[in-house]
Amino acid sequence: MCVFHMGVKFKDIVNPEPINFKDLEGKTVALDAANIIYQFLSIIRQADGTPLMDHQGKVTSHFSGILYRTTSLIEKGMKPFYVFDGAPSVLKKSTQLKRSEIKEESRKKWKEAMENGDIQEARKYASRTSRMSTDIIQGSKQLLEFMGIPYIQANGEGEAQASYMVDKGDAWCVGSQDYDCILFGATRMVKNLTITGGKTDLELIRLEKVLSDLQISRKQLVDVAILVGTDFNEGIKGIGAKKGLNLIKQHGDVFKVLNEMDVEMEVDPQELRDLFFEHNFVSEYELKWRNPDLEGAIEFLAGEHDFSEDRVINALNKLKKLDTSQSSLEKWF
């Protein structure tokens, strides 16, 4: 029997290193766009769970998140860029269907909580209803262009492309909450890369240290994930990260574990391995941070989507740290 997981669950076997923002000064950070924008859509909401919207009824929570998160990271000395998902793997269809079912159930419970006047419950369920639409993705890219922040369009999984760019040395780390990044080969990833993050909030995960601590290879780490469950396959019921690790260390690989347990998986484990090791990466790209189009950004956020013009200008003023020759953004008006 199998069980679904939304992203691989490695919390019990991976020990992150605490770091602070000073450690990231001068570093280029690849941000997993889908992972981060989904956070914004889930968290940036009104008291009753309703997302931020403009006068047209269009969701703007992601615009707020991108504006303030990105400019804050730049103010702290980082050079962020975003990596967007391309076409999803066919192996992800079952997971996407399961997620849709969860969102629909949460939507019903959100409505019930609102009818009962239970604002706390309403907000809890509302945060689970977020959806990434084409409009949200295209709008996010448009805002980044106005801000002068580069983004990469991946062929496949954005986190895989971001991990590839870290491995190549074009970024210092991936900024994501998803442990899949180390499965894709990211040498470093940083969790909890938020505006309010302090010394104890940021977590650095180094692939080399993880493998050394667990005394396994990256291929074996992927095998553990296959047993536990990933975005691309159902895990084996009753196998968590610790048990999966012990089984792989005892038997050597996922094939021997499945043979010993006399269990068949719906997806060929070799297909899953190949997805993590032979992903369709974009190898030619340009990372160039440009001067922002202030008038365009202000018109887009304040004019079209009802943001406060003063707050937008104050946030955009932080972008001057990307170009030390500019003493003030007033020079770009």
What residue ranges belong to the model's regions?
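Noncatalytic, basic helical substrate-engagement surface that gates or grips nucleic-acid strands
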Residues: 2-4, 8-13, 19, 23-167, ...
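A sequence-level detector of short, solvent-exposed, charge-rich linear segments
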Residues: 52, 56, 92, 102, ...
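Nuclease catalytic cores that cleave nucleic-acid phosphodiester bonds
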Residues: 49-50, 129-269
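Non-catalytic nucleic-acid-binding/docking modules located in mid-to-C-terminal regions
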Residues: 2-5, 12-14, 19-25, 40, ...
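Residue-level signature of catalytic and energy-coupling elements of molecular machines
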Residues: 32, 82, 178, 240, ...
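Short, surface-exposed, polar/charged, turn-prone segments marking secondary-structure boundaries
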Residues: 56-60, 108-112, 179-181, 201-204, ...
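Short alpha-helix boundary/capping motifs
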Residues: 101-102, 171-172, 190, 329-330
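Short linear functional motifs in flexible/disordered or boundary regions
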Residues: 92-94, 174, 256, 313
